[in-house]
Curated annotation (Swiss-Prot):
Site positions (Substrate discrimination): 16
UniProt cofactor note: Binds 2 magnesium ions per subunit.
A GO CC term assigned to this protein in UniProt: cytosol
Active site: 106
Annotated function: Poorly processive, error-prone DNA polymerase involved in untargeted mutagenesis. Copies undamaged DNA at stalled replication forks, which arise in vivo from mismatched or misaligned primer ends. These misaligned primers can be extended by PolIV. Exhibits no 3'-5' exonuclease (proofreading) activity. May be involved in translesional synthesis, in conjunction with the beta clamp from PolIII.
Coiled coil regions in record: none
Reactions catalysed according to its record: DNA(n) + a 2'-deoxyribonucleoside 5'-triphosphate = DNA(n+1) + diphosphate
Organism field: Stenotrophomonas maltophilia (strain R551-3)
Family annotation (NCBIfam families): PRK02406.1
GO-annotated molecular function: damaged DNA binding; DNA-directed DNA polymerase activity; magnesium ion binding
Domain UmuC per the UniProt entry, residue ranges: 7-187
Protein name: DNA polymerase IV
Length: 356
């Protein structure tokens, strides 16, 4: 009989903004937005005081300013965030060696066989959160469940500064009424497609056969089928290394190529901010486009050295747009900007612009 796993997903609360408020007492209790100012900037993080006004990470900074005119904008300091993240990671490692960081502010922990000797995963999560608070003066939320999928959902249930457990015997009761938009990978576009088929909850999803979901949604259909049943066999992988990072945007209305510039700029900044959470560098810039007819194109470029700034990434992505050779009247429903070929910093050989 397979032993049930005990998985914890720990998510720091408004991490970047909370670090800024911790280090500058004048910011405490005020709406803080971590972002560079400017028409092309995007929000890296928002304090809970700013979130009350609808400010969210990854939204354009100009929109955040409109939503919350009194917000205090603070430029991100990734070196400082990385240092705090390392403190938190050392706390995790006191309890288990099976720690899979997802970014600077969140990680999965497999505590099926913990170092600390504590039997209950809820006690381990509570202890970890207390240690984080005591040693960093920051708060974290945690989800405890039999697998990664459920633990990640649970960590958002009692935010901020709380924890929530989904025991094995309660998985069905938890999932059946759960809205499908809480399932990772189900964004607004997919949510609309599911709703058009009468699928609003995971309980609705369970009424569909696997073959029908795969026919309707391709390979993602299998993921939907499994998640609706609480199935996720993915292990916690401590040595997992980032191979690619990308950001995508699906438009409400299809756009011509010349109108994609603003989206490319914002996605380049979002991707760049995500890469700052890793210790490696991406060498190849990738531009992804999907036409109104659902044709997917990618254009990529590997420069002599990896991009060293958001501006370099942005400029290469914009240059790749000029390499798209479809008819001028082609319209696009999705654009993505990414970095791939991640590796440790080392000299690289000049690449060439190429198309897929």
């Amino acid at each position: 009989m397979t032993r049930l796993r005990k998985i914890i997903h720990v998510d720091m609360d408004a991490f970047y903004a909370s670090v800024e408020q911790r280090d500058d007492p004048s910011l405490r209790g005020k709406p803080v937005v971590v972002a560079w100012r400017g028409a092309r900037s995007v929000v890296c993080a928002a304090s809970y005081e700013a979130r009350v006004f609808g400010v969210r990470s990854a939204m354009p900074a100009v929109r955040a300013e409109r939503l919350c005119p009194d917000a205090i904008f603070v430029p991100p300091d990734f070196a400082r965030y990385k240092a705090v993240s390392q403190q938190v990671r050392e706390i995790f490692l006191r309890h288990t060696d099976l720690v899979e960081p997802l970014s600077l502010d969140e990680a999965y922990l497999d505590v099926t066989e913990p170092k600390s000797g504590m039997e209950l995963a809820t006690d381990i999560a509570r202890t970890i959160r207390a240690q984080i608070r005591e040693e960093t003066q920051l708060t974290a939320s945690a989800g405890i469940a039999p697998n990664k999928f459920l633990a990640k959902i649970a960590s958002d249930w009692r935010k901020p500064d709380g924890q929530f457990v989904i025991p094995p015997q309660r998985v069905d009761a938890f999932l059946l009424p759960l809205p499908v938009n809480r399932v990772p990978g189900v964004g607004k576009v997919m949510e609309g497609k599911l709703a058009a088929r009468g699928i609003v909850t995971c309980g609705d999803l369970r009424q569909w056969a696997l073959i029908d979901l795969e026919e309707a949604f391709g390979s993602f259909g299998r993921s939907l089928y499994n998640r609706a049943r609480g199935v996720d066999e993915r292990p916690v992988e401590p040595d997992q290394q980032v191979q690619s990072i990308s950001s995508e945007d699906t438009f409400a209305e299809d756009l011509p190529l010349e109108d994609l510039g603003e989206a490319i700029v914002q996605l380049a900044e979002k991707t760049w901010n995500a890469t700052r959470k890793t210790e490696r560098v991406g060498h190849t810039v990738v531009l992804k486009l999907k036409t109104a007819q659902f044709r997917i194109l990618t254009r990529s470029f590997t420069p002599e050295r990896p991009p060293e700034s958001m501006e370099e990434l942005r400029d290469i992505a914009l240059a790749l747009r000029a390499r798209v050779d479809l008819p001028a009247d082609t319209r696009y429903r999705l654009v993505g900007v990414g970095l791939s070929g991640f590796r440790d910093k080392e000299p690289v050989v000049q690449g060439e612009l190429f198309e897929h």
